């Protein structure tokens, strides 16, 4: 897919920041309009993250116009909003390949461009990394500046405040831009704050303020009076007390869609010393009415017709595993008012919208605070309630110590519903759920279940919920379920697998939703196929029986081979001195790049043909 760049006469002159900085300031409004239209035209044809980028067009232009990137370092938190940044940094012609196999990375990525200073994907990392870069720049002594752009959601995470607390303490030169898109800007207050921001960020104000401090330093009562008066005046229009207390000079809020005003304010702030925070107000989805009205639905989009203003409806296929979880959650809460469901800012993605509306007193969105979510669940369990933590595999990594220290050591009955286990797809290395079986399997007291279809998923959620002897996890993938018929809920016997197909010679031990692919291979080579169901406790008895009646065992899982379910089988076989070779099939020892789930599985030999080929090659 290619767009006619002649339709964007100003944008064509700004293929990179050096060209951008040659444009007259008066042309920046037209550039922003064209950049926003280019983003709409491109993403509507290729799919990708959408609403966030529409909201940061003016900020992106202003930052690259004022700062000498890539010498000056610009860091984007999470990266959903960085499409305009990629377009303006030499990647305009490849933007249609974003999130696709062998295409542009979905987030800023160090290996892709010198303008991408930090590889990102998870939230709230920008200020910590930016502070490290700022300290390095001070030691370097070349006058390099550092800017971090972070959203109002990401800044709520503890890591962001830890970094700001440190920055305020060591007084390094660092600009944090808080992109606040939670509310619209009042014209009157916005205009007043824009004017105030230029005054507060200007040289005259800084000189007077510092000079006044020196003059009044020997007169504490007067100095304190002036400080309080200043804070009172700023406080009427500037909600920055918290950031000031952390040691930042706070400027804002300002209109994040006034590119001329942003350029002037950023020019003023670039020369300032110490930690600075610029608070800008933006509209997520800016310039495209449907996305402005419903930015959540338009956050990441498939291909769509921009003239229609609607997203294509998903087919009438099987429900997603997230929806299966959400339905189970609502059904269980209907019979048990002690159920407490927790999510770290992933209500929609985890399938919890209906539950949050039907059972608001039993629903807790703790924001981007994975560590708190897990320990909060521990407290609920101690209090006699039944917590369910719904969390993506890749984000549970951020709360690993809490899982061990606050839940497992105390053997608390917390159920972890782990979504996006295994190959996730288009979001690439930072979002694949490759490691959860490995990092959970080594934790004492933890029960780990891997359903092969939606019915098993429901049964395992039910089993884990009613398991009161300690913590449990149910791990399921992104995407649609298989269409398996749903049975009445009942508890499964712990640590027991099911023989799915009887064959000879080779026994395939499958963990999770690769069962159809494993079945393809089993039929092709007449192998026995087992749905193991439990990673921990393992079905030791069944493994011993299979080892005695087969010449070889093969484990299949959509997790890292190192430390995963197959490693558990290996450990048991060696411990028992069973005389049978074992082949482990799973994710290799490297980070998995983006692509569709089907493409990635085929590349890694995890489709039916690939599993069959790996077994045949091993047996040869």
Curated annotation (Swiss-Prot):
One of its GO terms (molecular function) is thiamine pyrophosphate binding. Thiamine diphosphate binds at residues 80, 121-123, 153-154, 181, 288, 370. Its cofactor is Mg(2+); thiamine diphosphate. CDD domains: TPP_DXS, TPP_PYR_DXS_TK_like. Binds 1 Mg(2+) ion per subunit. InterPro entries: Dxylulose-5-P_synthase, THDP-binding, Transketo_C/PFOR_II, Transketolase-like_Pyr-bd, Transketolase_BS, Transketolase_C, Transketolase_CS. Gene3D superfamilies: 3.40.50.920, 3.40.50.970. Mg(2+) binds at residues 152, 181. It catalyses: D-glyceraldehyde 3-phosphate + pyruvate + H(+) = 1-deoxy-D-xylulose 5-phosphate + CO2. Transmembrane segments: none annotated. Pfam families: DXP_synthase_N (PF13292), Transket_pyr (PF02779), Transketolase_C (PF02780). SUPFAM superfamilies: Thiamin diphosphate-binding fold (THDP-binding), TK C-terminal domain-like. One of its GO terms (cellular component) is cytosol. The keyword Transferase applies. Pathway: Metabolic intermediate biosynthesis; 1-deoxy-D-xylulose 5-phosphate biosynthesis; 1-deoxy-D-xylulose 5-phosphate from D-glyceraldehyde 3-phosphate and pyruvate: step 1/1. GO terms for biological process: 1-deoxy-D-xylulose 5-phosphate biosynthetic process; isopentenyl diphosphate biosynthetic process, methylerythritol 4-phosphate pathway; terpenoid biosynthetic process; thiamine biosynthetic process. Keywords: Isoprene biosynthesis, Magnesium, Metal-binding, Thiamine biosynthesis, Thiamine pyrophosphate, Transferase. HAMAP family: DXP_synth. Belongs to the transketolase family. DXPS subfamily. Catalyzes the acyloin condensation reaction between C atoms 2 and 3 of pyruvate and glyceraldehyde 3-phosphate to yield 1-deoxy-D-xylulose-5-phosphate (DXP). Homodimer. This is 1-deoxy-D-xylulose-5-phosphate synthase. The gene is dxs.
């Amino acid at each position: 897919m290619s767009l006619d760049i002649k339709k964007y006469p100003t944008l064509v002159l700004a293929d990179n920041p050096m060209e951008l900085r040659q444009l007259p300031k008066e042309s920046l409004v037209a550039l922003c309009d064209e950049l926003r239209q280019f983003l709409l035209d491109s993403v509507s044809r290729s799919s990708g993250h959408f609403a966030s980028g529409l909201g940061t067009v003016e900020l992106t232009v202003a930052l690259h116009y004022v700062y000498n990137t890539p010498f000056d370092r610009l860091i984007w938190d999470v990266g959903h909003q960085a499409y305009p940044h990629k377009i303006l940094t030499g990647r305009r012609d490849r933007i249609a390949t974003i999130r696709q196999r062998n295409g542009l990375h979905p987030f800023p990525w160090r290996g892709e461009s010198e303008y991408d200073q930090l590889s990102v994907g998870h939230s709230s990392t920008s200020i910590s990394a930016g502070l490290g870069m700022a300290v390095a720049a001070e030691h370097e002594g070349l006058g390099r500046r550092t800017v971090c752009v972070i959203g109002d959601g990401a800044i709520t995470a503890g890591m962001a405040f830890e970094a700001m607390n440190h920055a305020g303490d060591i007084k390094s030169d660092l600009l944090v831009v808080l992109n606040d898109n939670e509310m619209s800007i009042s014209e009157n207050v916005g205009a007043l704050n824009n004017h105030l921001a230029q005054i507060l960020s200007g040289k005259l104000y800084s000189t007077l303020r510092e000079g006044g401090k020196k003059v009044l330093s020997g007169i504490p009562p007067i100095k304190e009076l002036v400080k309080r008066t200043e804070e009172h005046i700023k406080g009427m229009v500037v909600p920055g007390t918290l950031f000031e207390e952390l040691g930042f000079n706070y400027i804002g809020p300002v209109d994040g869609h006034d590119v001329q005003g942003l350029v002037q304010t950023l020019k003023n702030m670039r020369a300032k010393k110490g930690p600075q925070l610029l608070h800008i107000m933006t509209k997520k989805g800016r310039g495209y009415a449907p996305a402005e009205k419903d930015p959540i639905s338009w956050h990441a989009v498939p291909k769509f017709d921009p003239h229609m203003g609607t997203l294509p409806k998903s087919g009438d296929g099987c429900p997603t595993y997230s929806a299966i979880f959400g339905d189970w959650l609502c059904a269980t809460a209907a019979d048990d008012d002690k159920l407490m469901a927790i999510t770290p800012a992933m209500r929609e993605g985890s399938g919890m919208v209906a539950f949050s509306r039907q059972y608001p007193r039993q629903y807790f969105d703790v924001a981007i605070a994975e560590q708190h979510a897990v320990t909060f669940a521990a407290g609920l369990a101690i209090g006699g309630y039944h917590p369910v933590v719904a969390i993506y595999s890749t984000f549970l990594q951020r709360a690993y110590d809490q899982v061990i220290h606050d839940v497992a050591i105390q053997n608390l009955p917390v159920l972890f519903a782990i979504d996006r286990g295994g190959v996730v797809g288009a979001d690439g290395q930072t979002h694949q759920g490759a490691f959860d079986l490995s990092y959970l399997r080594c934790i004492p007291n933890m029960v780990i279940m891997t359903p092969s279809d939606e019915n098993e998923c429901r049964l395992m959620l039910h089993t884990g919920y009613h398991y009161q002897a300690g913590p449990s996890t149910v791990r399921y993938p992104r995407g649609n379920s298989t269409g398996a018929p749903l049975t009445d809920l009942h508890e499964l016997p712990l640590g027991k697998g099911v023989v799915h197909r009887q064959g000879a010679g080779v026994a395939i031990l499958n963990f999770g939703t690769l069962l159809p692919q494993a079945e393809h291979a089993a039929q092709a080579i007449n192998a026995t196929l087992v749905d193991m169901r439990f990673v921990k406790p393992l079905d030791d008895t069944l493994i011993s029986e299979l080892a005695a009646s087969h010449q070889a065992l093969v484990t299949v899982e959509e997790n890292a081979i190192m430390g995963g379910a197959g490693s558990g089988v290996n450990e048991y076989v060696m411990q028992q001195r069973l005389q049978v070779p074992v082949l482990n099939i799973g994710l290799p020892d490297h980070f998995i790049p983006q692509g569709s789930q089907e493409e990635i599985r085929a590349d890694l030999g995890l489709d039916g043909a690939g599993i069959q080929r790996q077994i045949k090659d091993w047996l040869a």
